[in-house]
Amino acid sequence: LDAGITFARSHDAHLDVLCLGIDRVQTGYYYVGAAPIAPIMVQETLDQAGKDAHAVEAAVRARLAAEDIRWAVDTAIAQLGAFGGEVGRLARFADLVLVPQPYGKNAAPEQEAILEAALFDGRAPALVLPADQPNATYGKRVVIAWNQSDEAMAAIRAALPLLKTASLVDVAVIAPPSHGPERSDPG
């Protein structure tokens, strides 16, 4: 949240925050005898996800109320594996999605799916914040993943304002073809 506030302030941007309550219980694995209580269990776990989302929403609203930026908060509840549509629906209206690094010792299991939903369902560019320095000055060193796709070109176009201010831009060429008129050349 702090990184989003800093980014919004430095770019005179509007910050939208999604507070997502995730039901992590996978209902497909109940045993046969659980059929009478399964609907109650599903409702209980969804209710808990809703309480979690609303608690986060209250904390986010309290934090943002003291800030001098434009902001909005959205809250959603979804089951594990089914929240991609909700994330994508909101991400498609964003110019940029800020997400924590999806891998590492403190990463939540759903962070990878949230990033993928923003990128592929929402078709939004994403800025992955480093896990060890989430509030550091970001955008000085940028890594671009290039695979010659339309998506890669759209991401680079969307990132041009950040790329122009970067001190160093690295291009990671992903699975380049061995031959062809448009062969990627990292040199």
Locate the predicted segments by residue.
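Small/aliphatic-rich secondary-structure junction motif
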Residues: 1-42, 121-122, 134, 138-187
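Gly/Ser-rich helix-loop-strand patches that form or flank binding pockets
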Residues: 6, 85-135
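Generic structural signal for residues in well-ordered beta-strands
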Residues: 15, 71-75, 126
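Structural beta-alpha unit
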Residues: 22-24, 47, 59-97
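A short acidic, glycine-rich active-site loop
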Residues: 38-55
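Short, flexible loop segments at the rims of nucleotide/cofactor-binding pockets, characterized by
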Residues: 73-78, 104-107, 148
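Short, small-residue-enriched loops and turns at beta-alpha junctions
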Residues: 78-81, 105-106, 177-183
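Amphipathic coiled-coil/heptad-repeat helices and related helical stalk/stem segments
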Residues: 83, 111, 152-155
